[in-house]
């Protein structure tokens, strides 16, 4: 198995330019993000999990791992190839077969991946790629022949899947929405923070489940941070995803653009103050200006609902305890960021927060060896690392008792 997975990883790296262009054409993300982040990370996941293929006996001490069986994998439109790698790499390393369904708006990289799998001489039938819309996904969920289902997407659809599979002997992993808090303390390196905040919310047009869409700033530095953020937003370039100078590309679909616009209008109606830089948008396509809200209340929809777009809500706090309370005051629990020079404060905050991933003085940093997943309505189960192997195996006693 390791031989095949290593081949896939190498072929992805060799054909990275093809995949990068395809991801940007299909999904609208800037080519520099597809080229420098998505494709290298996808390849890295296959490289990492290839190393586990012959070491599974050492991953679970005292237990004998067996393949779960047939895995159904449904992936979203925001990171098509990367999410395919998150599902396929551990599933193959553990000896499973997979039926992979990409999102209906971004199927192209999955189809090119099928060509790579054939090029790697993966045996026929080990990975099956099924394209289609919601009806296709529902048919896969309700098929009855799956031993394991893994889904990344919206919380509403994830809840529906969980209800449909209730009472059935199918292992389930759900990686759903988020409303992450990026928390800035007064002792933080402000310029570094600003770059981390921008990366945390405007990367991939905000189409990121773990995006830092809520900014919590300690009161003494709140005005300074907002001032620097506004200045930085004025330098962001919105436009053609295939232009290497573009910072924000296209919104994925008309449906998503309508949702973003509606929630931004709701924020204005509820009394928040909207700032958008004076930048030109292309005449054709689905584009939205990077947006910043101040004077935001925790009860506002923009502070509670996942917008999944380039929209940042700024709130303030006085004490670490208040920051924790506000950060946890959401239905989600996927990720968070903490910016401070005090290591003890980082550790204390991380323990108090209900977030599956907590970044310290950075944001949106990923590694295949680090597990990723959430709490509450952000789902359950972990992907990546040794913990990410567990959903793809059945553990039997090691020996006869």
Task: Label the predicted regions.
Residues 122, 146, 183, 237, ...:
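Conserved C-terminal structural/oligomerization subdomain of aldehyde/semialdehyde dehydrogenase
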Residues 16, 31, 190, 222, ...:
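Residues at or immediately preceding the N-termini of alpha-helices
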Residues 156-297, 360:
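ALDH superfamily catalytic-core signature
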Residues 1-56:
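Glycine-rich loop-to-alpha-helix module at the N-terminal edge of alpha/beta enzyme cores
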Residues 2-9, 20, 43, 110, ...:
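Hydrophobic face of alpha-helices
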Residues 1, 23, 46, 95, ...:
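Residue-level signal for inorganic ion chemistry
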Residues 55-192, 317:
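Rossmann-like NAD(P) dinucleotide-binding subdomain of oxidoreductase/dehydrogenase enzymes
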Residues 10-17, 28, 32, 51, ...:
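Generic secondary-structure signature for well-ordered alpha-helical cores
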